[in-house]
């Protein structure tokens, strides 16, 4: 009877987890299409507030990308980037190592300007002598070429854009690309050839049309902003949050980002500079999140370099950590992150050995089941002892009738005498569920599993089984486990009905789960069946059935 109740407990915990997830996704109001126009500049500033005029979010989403001949194209081994000479904004990014679709050839596009979405990265210089302004407009840069390409054997590629102000001051905006990397160094070089001191500060912001995440109950995902400060290592700031309240946080270092499933864009200013983190939403439905950096005084006859890093690519934890110690937290494993991180590292270790993510999942399943085996054995031993006590428990029930207090006392004395822990069957279940949930988030959040094949028809472990074969096999394995566990004749009829339907309910739920997660549960069931046979054989020799 205890084994049946444990299966019911698994089901209840599982369904509760799914319902909690859906509640988390739905409790906030839906994104609004527009909000009252507000300046991108927070009320408080790092320095010289009146001169800080970061260009506002556009009042309306532009219709389409300008003609390609007007843009500067940069191609590396990882990225295809398009830069608008007006302001030097990054208006397009294609990730060449990541396909849009598993069987297609088109690369995944992150930044773009289309009729459906407006998503760009903007940076500039503001302040008294800045060349970008919400009033005066943006600087129009010149470039020696309209196309740059990282050559074979070349490790870095510099793309310089130049602008000369009406005062004769030369501003050079240099984009530095590195082989194998998704981060781009944006370096402003200012040569003050005038006879007056200049004051400028750099800003960087990400503009994104408000768009609802393609989330579901089985695969919840987040699309929106996030930021980090010295006090808060990682915090999401959704489109709704931006519409409700503008960010205005002063911090040393920090970063800002726009997140979506598997991919991220982020501005990372210098860690030792004092920056302002800000956000806003325009009347046209554009969400902004960005930073405004330190104010620089540039004496006549001197040069000054002001830089920041921009990342546009997959949520690669190693690459993100190298850019900023907390940027890898955009791979959000939820409240069980402390358990998910070692699971992820172990999964990566197994994959590095076998070269197949599906086999790595099988190995991590065997590892988890092996670690829990002593508890599993204790669980089945406890359940067998409980079954053997059923006749004595029935006698107690007949003796004490409806006197629950005396019945409870007598049962506890019996358990103590027979050295039986009535809760002994629950511990492995309670330990297994957090591991299952943590692995669920690892498989859901880790970009390494996107389009990762297993074998045969499973060509992508991050999405559902296209033919539903594994969920059905998983349901069959649950049915076999159920039949192997003796059902007590005194079991409540309602529990019996629920038990009979549990494999069907789980099968239906798992139809839309990522194939990698279903593989974990299926292999876990097969291991559990094998362990049950071994444990039951040993118990029978001891006279326990």
UniProtKB/Swiss-Prot annotation:
Keywords: Cell inner membrane, Cell membrane, Chaperone, Membrane, Protein transport, Transmembrane, Transmembrane helix, Transport. It is found in: Cell inner membrane. The chain crosses the membrane at residues 6-26, 346-366, 424-444, 461-481, 504-524. It is a multi-pass membrane protein. One of its GO terms (biological process) is protein insertion into membrane. Its main location: membrane. GO terms for cellular component: plasma membrane. Residues 44-65 are annotated as: Disordered. Pfam families: 60KD_IMP (PF02096), YidC_periplas (PF14849). PANTHER family: CYTOCHROME C OXIDASE ASSEMBLY PROTEIN COX18, MITOCHONDRIAL, OXA1. HAMAP family: YidC_type1. Belongs to the OXA1/ALB3/YidC family. Type 1 subfamily. Interacts with the Sec translocase complex via SecD. Specifically interacts with transmembrane segments of nascent integral membrane proteins during membrane integration. Required for the insertion and/or proper folding and/or complex formation of integral membrane proteins into the membrane. Involved in integration of membrane proteins that insert both dependently and independently of the Sec translocase complex, as well as at least some lipoproteins. Aids folding of multispanning membrane proteins. This is Membrane protein insertase YidC. It comes from Shewanella pealeana (strain ATCC 700345 / ANG-SQ1).
């Amino acid at each position: 009877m205890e084994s049946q109740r444990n299966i019911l407990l698994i089901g209840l915990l599982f369904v509760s987890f799914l319902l909690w997830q859906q509640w988390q996704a739905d409790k906030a109001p839906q994104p609004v299409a527009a909000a009252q126009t507000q300046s991108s500049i927070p009320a408080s500033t790092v320095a010289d507030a009146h001169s800080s005029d970061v260009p506002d979010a556009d009042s309306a989403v532009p219709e389409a990308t300008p003609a390609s001949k007007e843009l500067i194209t940069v191609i590396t081994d990882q990225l295809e980037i398009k830069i608008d000479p007006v302001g030097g904004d990054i208006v397009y990014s294609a990730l060449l190592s990541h396909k849009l679709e598993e069987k297609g050839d088109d690369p995944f596009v992150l930044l773009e300007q289309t009729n459906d979405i407006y998503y760009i990265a903007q940076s500039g210089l503001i302040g008294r002598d800045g060349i970008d302004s919400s009033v005066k407009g943006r600087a129009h840069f010149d470039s020696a070429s309209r196309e740059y390409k990282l050559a074979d054997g070349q490790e870095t590629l510099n793309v310089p854009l130049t602008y000369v102000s009406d005062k004769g001051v030369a501003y050079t905006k240099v984009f530095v690309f590195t082989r194998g990397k998704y981060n781009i160094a944006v370096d402003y070089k200012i040569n003050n050839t005038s006879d007056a001191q200049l004051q400028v500060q750099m800003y960087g912001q990400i503009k994104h049309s408000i768009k609802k995440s393609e989330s579901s109950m089985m695969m919840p995902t987040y699309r929106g902003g996030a930021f980090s400060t010295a006090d808060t290592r990682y915090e999401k700031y959704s489109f709704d949050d931006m519409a409700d309240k503008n960010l205005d946080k002063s911090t040393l270092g920090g970063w800002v980002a726009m997140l979506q499933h598997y991919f991220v864009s982020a501005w990372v200013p210098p860690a030792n500079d004092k920056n302002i983190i800000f956000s806003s939403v325009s009347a046209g439905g554009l969400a902004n999140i960005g930073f405004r950096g330190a104010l620089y005084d540039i004496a006549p006859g001197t040069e000054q370099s002001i830089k920041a890093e921009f990342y546009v690519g997959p949520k690669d934890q190693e690459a993100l950590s190298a850019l900023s110690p907390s940027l890898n937290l955009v791979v959000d494993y939820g409240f069980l992150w402390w358990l998910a991180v070692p699971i992820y590292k172990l999964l990566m270790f197994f994959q590095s050995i076998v070269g197949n993510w599906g086999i790595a999942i099988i190995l991590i399943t065997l590892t988890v089941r092996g670690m829990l085996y002593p508890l599993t054995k204790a669980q089945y031993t406890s359940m067998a002892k409980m079954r053997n006590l059923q006749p004595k428990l029935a006698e107690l029930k007949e003796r004490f009738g409806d006197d629950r207090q005396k019945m409870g006392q007598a049962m506890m004395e019996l358990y103590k005498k027979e050295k039986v822990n009535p809760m002994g069957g629950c511990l492995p279940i309670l330990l297994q569920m957090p591991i299952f949930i943590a692995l669920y988030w690892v498989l859901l959040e880790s970009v390494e599993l996107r389009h990762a094949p297993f074998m045969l028809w499973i060509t992508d472990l991050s999405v559902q089984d296209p033919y539903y074969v594994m969920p059905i096999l998983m349901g069959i394995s649950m049915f076999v486990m159920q039949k192997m566990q003796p059902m007590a004749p005194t079991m409540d009829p309602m529990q019996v009905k629920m038990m009979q339907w549990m494999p069907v309910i789980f099968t239906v739920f798992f139809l839309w789960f990522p194939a990698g997660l279903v593989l974990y549960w299926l292999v876990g069931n097969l291991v559990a069946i094998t362990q049950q046979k071994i444990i039951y054989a040993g118990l029978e020799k001891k006279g326990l059935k």
